[in-house]
């Protein structure tokens, strides 16, 4: 062996130390299980594991001693570390040389005892002790008949009749005697070979071994009650669910009930339960396409929302909390184009080269919805909110949000909530009653949910509470909902239990309207599923036109993976949910309406891009408090910060925009889209 090879051998031996330490830590954890240590069969298996690890450490020590290297100190340190591991292992299992021991209570002498090894209840080889016993429905249970004597051909059992009482196999007595020392090694090798052959049966011995039965999940239900017969058994109650942590070849399994009690139960009293996974992937959020590039801006700039996303197990009782916990429910996702499965074209964005505009896409539902008013609402102390979204109510107990969440702030007058019906210079756009609804779902179970909520003070701060919700059906008799005024009734758990008459319920007046003819081309250029403020319609159309121009018309190489740097495509979807920034854009845009009326669509798109750069893009880069529609103080501070720059822009005082402190260069990646990342496939 060369010197270079010896150094490699020593280094390889040192690299195995973490593996040995992990195995010893696992054995120390097993030793703390006092219940397992009280059973002789468990203890025997534990001792066998320690002995096997002892043998591996001895072999490893010989390998280190034989290694030739000039780094003597490294070899000494390795041997010293190995000795420490052996000391820990010896402390765990003093029975180093003892391979088995007797648990028989018979008074016969050792010479008269039969030399046999018949195990009545043997520890399952399908579950390792280091696996978590508390995992629910995420493991496999493999039941295999293990026979230490000559295996017999498995006899097919007749199917059990429903009227017959299920009976377990009779218990076999535990009689494990100590074999002769000379046969110990051979018996252990034979046992390991038998277990290995049973766990991994080959084609040649398939006739001798019963095929394993594999099921997904370890949750079973008791089909009948069963009383414990001996110490260590667990009582079964009909209809109760139990978690199986260990299996046996004789049919006696280790079960865990809902109170944490553990014991042996007969498998014939159990029936497997196929439970649904805890976290069902969202139909919307699992396929976001290019929108995930835009999400990166929000997840890095808003720590509170990023922290909320980690609380996946939290159940949201209103749309507001769902919106705060999931960025996928905002316009930052639904506005950006979505790549198709080919990773070349787009799912909902097409360009007409003949007309030089975005190709129109007709969907099943394309309406203007107006919230007229809410009646007979309870008196509230703080701010009121109205949230809307498309939801799938196929499963009433677990509705699925399939669009973004749109928010309105009503004007509360006693028990009636009003909304702004016309565009106003003094009112905010978040109070405007009309919103555009586009949906390409054909299923009648996809409906529009309208939820009323209010803010209440709690010990941890301001919290949003629901006052009830109602559903507006969008597909009626396989046709789109007709244009009319609908009277809906808010409902919640308390009102449902009270069974109030309709005359005393909280009413919602919702008016459904067709899209005006001069706005149809704008609406048809938008994504297939979206809900947004009707005042934003020109902005959204120009955004989609610029996206089609850059991503399709002017893109010479659709296979290119280069980042597309464009401030409008990357930043505008993020500011769409911030109504205070959108208010500024709307006011400036309104002053240009007369001039814009004389320009074509391409020129209007260019003008919108300049307006965006001078307002939303610039304001978005200002260091100020994060947007929160629920906090009026936050909105007031943001308004004061932005108004100072807007006034300077209107007066032409551009000197105020010059930075008076040290600044960092702009990171172009923050204003770019990664179209061909692994997250972009639809």
Curated annotation (Swiss-Prot):
Q: Where is the composition biased (Acidic residues)?
A: 128-148
Q: Write out the ranges of the annotated region (Disordered).
A: 96-188
Q: What happens when the gene is disrupted?
A: Impaired male mating behavior.
User: Where in the body, by tissue, does this protein show up?
Assistant: Expressed in ciliated sensory neurons of the head (amphid neurons) and the tail in hermaphrodites (phasmid neurons) and males (sensory ray neurons).
Coiled coil regions, renumbered to chain: 10-100
Q: So where does this one cross the membrane?
A: none
Q: Where is the SH3 domain?
A: 215-275
- What PROSITE patterns would the database entry show? SH3
Q: List this protein's GO terms for biological process.
A: determination of adult lifespan; neuronal signal transduction; non-motile cilium assembly; protein localization; protein localization involved in establishment of planar polarity; response to hermaphrodite contact; turning behavior involved in mating
InterPro entries noted in UniProt: NPHP1, SH3-like_dom_sf, SH3_domain
Give the matching SMART domains: SH3
Q: Which key words are in the record?
A: Behavior, Cilium biogenesis/degradation, Coiled coil, SH3 domain
Q: Which GO terms describe its cellular component?
A: ciliary basal body; ciliary base; ciliary transition zone; cilium; cytoplasm; non-motile cilium
Q: Which PANTHER family match?
A: NEPHROCYSTIN, NEPHROCYSTIN-1
Into which family does the record put it? Belongs to the nephrocystin-1 family.
Function description: Plays a role in the extension of dendrites from phasmid ciliated sensory neurons. May be necessary for initial assembly of the cilium.
Name the UniProt record assigns to this protein: Nephrocystin-1-like protein
């Amino acid at each position: 062996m060369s010197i270079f090879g010896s150094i490699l051998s020593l280094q390889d031996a040192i690299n195995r130390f973490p593996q040995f330490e992990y195995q010893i830590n696992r054995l120390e954890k097993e030793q703390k299980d006092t219940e397992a240590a009280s059973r002789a069969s468990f203890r025997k298996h534990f001792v066998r594991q320690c002995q096997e690890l002892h043998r591996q450490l001895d072999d490893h020590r010989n390998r280190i001693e034989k290694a030739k290297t000039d780094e003597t100190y490294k070899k000494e340190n390795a041997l010293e570390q190995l000795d420490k591991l052996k000391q820990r292992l010896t402390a765990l299992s003093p029975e180093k040389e003892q391979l088995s021991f007797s648990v028989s209570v018979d008074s016969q002498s050792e010479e008269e005892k039969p030399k046999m090894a018949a195990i009545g209840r043997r520890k399952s080889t399908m579950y390792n002790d280091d696996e978590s016993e508390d995992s629910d429905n995420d493991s496999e249970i493999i039941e295999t008949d293990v026979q230490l004597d000559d295996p017999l051909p498995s006899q097919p059992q007749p199917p059990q009749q429903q009227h017959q009482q299920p009976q377990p196999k009779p218990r076999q007595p535990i009689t494990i005697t100590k074999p002769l020392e000379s046969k110990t090694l051979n018996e252990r090798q034979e046992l390991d070979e038998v277990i290995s052959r049973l766990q991994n049966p080959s084609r040649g011995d398939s006739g001798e071994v019963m095929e394993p039965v594999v099921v997904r999940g370890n949750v079973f239900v008791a089909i009948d009650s069963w009383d414990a017969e001996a110490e260590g058994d667990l009582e079964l109650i009909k209809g109760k669910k139990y978690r199986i942590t260990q299996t046996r070849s004789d049919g006696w399994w280790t079960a865990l009930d809902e109170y944490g009690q553990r014991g042996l139960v007969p498998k014939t009293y159990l029936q497997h339960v196929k439970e649904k996974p805890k976290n069902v992937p969202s139909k919307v959020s699992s396929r976001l396409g290019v929108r995930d590039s835009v999400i990166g801006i929000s997840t890095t700039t808003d720590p509170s929302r990023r922290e909320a996303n980690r609380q996946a197990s939290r159940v949201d009782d209103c749309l507001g909390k769902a919106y705060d916990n999931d960025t996928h429910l905002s316009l930052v996702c639904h506005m950006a184009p979505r790549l198709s499965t080919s990773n070349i074209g787009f799912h909902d964005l097409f360009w007409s080269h003949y007309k030089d505009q975005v190709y129109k896409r007709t969907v099943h539902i394309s309406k203007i919805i107006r919230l007229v008013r809410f009646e007979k609402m309870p008196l509230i102390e703080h701010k009121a909110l109205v949230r809307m979204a498309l939801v799938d109510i196929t499963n009433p107990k677990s509705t699925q949000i399939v669009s973004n969440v749109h928010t309105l702030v009503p004007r509360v007058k006693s028990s009636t909530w009003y909304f702004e019906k016309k565009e106003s210079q003094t009112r905010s756009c978040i109070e405007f009653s009309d919103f555009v609804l586009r949906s390409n779902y054909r299923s009648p179970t996809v409906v529009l949910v309208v939820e009323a909520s209010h803010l209440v003070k709690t010990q941890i701060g301001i919290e949003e509470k629901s006052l009830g919700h109602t559903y507006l059906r969008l597909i009626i008799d396989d046709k789109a909902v007709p244009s009319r005024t609908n009277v809906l009734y808010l409902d919640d758990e308390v009102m449902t239990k009270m069974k109030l008459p309709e005359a005393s319920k909280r009413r919602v007046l919702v008016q459904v309207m067709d899209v005006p003819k001069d706005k149809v081309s704008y609406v048809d250029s938008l994504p297939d599923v979206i809900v947004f403020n009707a005042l934003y319609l020109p902005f959204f159309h120009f955004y989609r036109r610029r996206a089609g121009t850059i991503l399709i018309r002017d893109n010479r190489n659709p296979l290119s993976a280069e980042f597309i740097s464009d401030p409008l495509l990357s930043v505008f979807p993020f500011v769409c949910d911030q109504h205070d920034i959108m208010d500024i854009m709307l006011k400036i845009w309104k002053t240009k309406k007369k001039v814009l009326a004389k320009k074509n669509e391409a020129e209007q798109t260019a003008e919108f891009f300049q307006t965006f750069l001078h307002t939303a893009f610039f304001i978005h880069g200002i260091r100020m408090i994060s947007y929160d529609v629920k906090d009026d103080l936050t909105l007031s501070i943001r308004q004061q910060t932005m108004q100072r720059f807007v006034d300077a822009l209107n007066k032409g005082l551009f000197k105020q925009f010059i930075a008076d402190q040290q600044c960092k260069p702009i990171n172009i990646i923050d204003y770019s889209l990664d179209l061909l990342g692994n997250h972009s496939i639809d």
